[in-house]
């Protein structure tokens, strides 16, 4: 299964956090083609810089290492994603989540997320 990981889903999965649903854990561990948006990597870096997230090493090397370790690919932000972002209604104000929603819609891929705010958009949510 190909899917985009929400930032918290990625962080919870690599930490073995029990807040992940069994279904989301199975997708993370199974033979899936998972993507992490560069928007999520940017969000992680910002959270570390603001002191809202502690990681065992600098965010960039840590995330890149975890991506390689778990066979997760990155999803770049392209012009089509930006145009889809612009068209989104303002149900949700978090710009990182809105970019993930735009990418999900534009790429026609489900999002792995526990965030109920994603349900206000026509994205397929896995949890």
Q: Model-flagged regions — what are they?
A:
Residues 1-37, 50-65, 107, 116-120:
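Short, well-structured N-terminal submotif of metal-dependent ribonuclease cores
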Residues 6, 43, 97, 115:
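Acidic active-site catalytic centers that drive phospho-/nucleotidyl reactions
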Residues 7-8, 44, 85, 104:
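Generic structural signal for small/hydrophobic residues in well-ordered secondary structure
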Residues 24, 41-42, 96-97, 101:
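Alpha-helical structural signal
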Residues 56-64, 68-114, 126:
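Active-site neighborhoods of divalent-metal-dependent phosphate/nucleic-acid chemistry enzymes
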